[in-house]
Amino acid sequence: MGKRSKILALLLALTLALTPVSTASALTPAEVTIDALSAKSFNGAELTLIKLLAETSKYTKHSVTYRSENLKVSGVLYIPKGKGPFPGVVLGHGYIDTKIYKNGQGMRREQDYLAARGFVVLHTDYRNHSFGDDDPDSQLKFRMDYSTDVINAGLALRNSKIRTLDKKKIAYMGRSMGGGIGFNVAVAKSAKGVFSSFVLFAPTSANYVENFNKWGRGNPERANPIVKFVGLPEENPSFWASVSPENYWSQVSAPIMIHHGDKDESCPIRWARAAAQGLNGAGKELSFHIYRGEGHNLMAGWGKAMARSIDFMGRNWQRSEP
């Protein structure tokens, strides 16, 4: 090999060595189904106080982190003042762009309302939000990753060192996307017993095709990676059925309450009605409340909905381990 050839070979080798290697995700469609969620083991723990954010005569509010899979997930925690024991509730917020999301954002009025009435409240930010860890495959996980974070939030609360918490009384409350996540958790067999009941405000559809049609089609940034991963619903209907909780209502093991405004333009009331029909058809305990003239964010009926929710959670505490 001549001198020039050796130099070219060396330059080529250096170029290859310094060029970042693009690694495709090893994630498979089978890993992001409800069956996969049902088969998981959960490790929610290490609930850690990071910073005192506020203190009132009724509670303290802290930024926190907890363990979910191999990630650190952030959130906010409210601890009522007093001897307790206080019941607990995990809150799951609706969709907010992660680029603008702030710690504890999304259900602040519910946080204050519940904490002021004697609930230990853990509001999860989910992975990829606020100052928690990121999951590069999150966009392809059909909210099963956020569902995992919710389940682990319940377990982290139960495994915490909060002495005033009644660890046998923990419920879930979710709104919009967080409501749809609640459906996932409610049908996940491996999450049985983590939450004593589910309260869902204006949930997204329990048929994932409906969610994709509304927010995915026509939005290449969202749709293209998903379509490349699993295909369109009409191309791969069996997969899309496998991520839709409406096909798993028989697996629900805790009572569900749904609040929905009949003028909701974001999550149409027909989605909630379809879920209610499916749950009733499966013989599950459901309390379904429609608020006339209300949109996606309940206004006039919100106080009544929260009072109903507290009563519902109180009637459905289960004293069983997960």
What annotation goes with each model-predicted range?
Residues 155, 179-191:
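Short glycine-enriched nucleophile-adjacent loop
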Residues 38-83:
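N-terminal cap/lid segment of alpha/beta-hydrolase-fold proteins
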Residues 140-161:
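Alpha/beta-hydrolase active-site loop
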Residues 273-322:
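C-terminal catalytic histidine-bearing segment of alpha/beta-hydrolase fold enzymes
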Residues 265-271:
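Conserved alpha/beta-hydrolase "acid-adjacent" motif
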Residues 98-101, 208-248, 254:
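Mobile cap/lid helix-loop segments that gate and shape the active-site cleft of serine hydrolases
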Residues 252, 258-260, 264:
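Short beta-strand/loop motif that positions the catalytic acidic residue
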Residues 84-86, 91-133, 207-208:
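Short substrate-entry loop that stabilizes the transition state in hydrolases
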